[in-house]
Regions:
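Catalytic lumenal/periplasmic loop and adjoining terminal transmembrane helix
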Residues: 1-172
Length: 173
């Protein structure tokens, strides 16, 4: 739902930051722009990653009917050194680096899916769209070792599996 909304409302090639999970589970699956995919391939090659990882990126890149984006991952404490993963960030850096959109995935009932409170405070007032699966008073129950956001009980409080996705548009001028 969120990926489809982004593809319909955000121009191809736009710079999008995804916050704040180390896992890609739960984030909208967006296609990389050709330039972003080439940059990642080059950096992964220098880091010694195999052809399998390259092929994964190429498969994403080949979905030509879908728009591609320059994706940045916002992850505090990440020390990977990749240009697309930022461990230090705030609204000023996002503006300086011309990030137009921020996509935040979070889920209050799972430890691995929390937003960054300092960035969340800075993004107040920039919200454009939210996809929230929580609909009722029932609290969903999860297998703590499962990263797929599929409840095992407490379904009365859910409209769908997955985290809450919030999309923000930042004024980069």
């Amino acid at each position: 739902m969120a990926a489809r909304w982004i593809e319909q409302h955000v121009a191809a090639g736009a710079k999008i930051a995804r916050c704040c999970s180390r896992s890609l589970y739960g984030h909208p699956q967006l296609r990389l722009s050709l330039g972003a995919a080439e940059q990642r391939k080059a950096e992964l090659s220098r880091a010694g990653y195999s052809y399998r990882r390259w092929r994964y990126l190429q498969a994403i890149e080949e979905q030509a009917s879908r728009p591609g984006y320059d994706l940045v991952e916002l992850i505090r404490g990440d020390d990977s050194g990749y240009s697309w993963t930022w461990s230090q960030y705030d609204l000023n850096r996002l503006r300086r680096e011309r990030v137009e959109w921020v996509v935040v995935q979070e889920y209050p009932h799972l430890n691995y899916s929390h937003s960054d409170p300092s960035l969340a405070a800075q993004l107040q007032g920039y919200a454009v769209k939210t996809f929230d699966p929580l609909t009722g008073a029932a609290t969903p129950v999860y297998d703590r070792n499962d990263a797929f956001y599929l409840a095992v009980a407490g379904f009365g409080g859910l409209s769908r599996p997955g985290p809450k996705i919030s999309i923000y548009r930042i004024d980069t001028q």
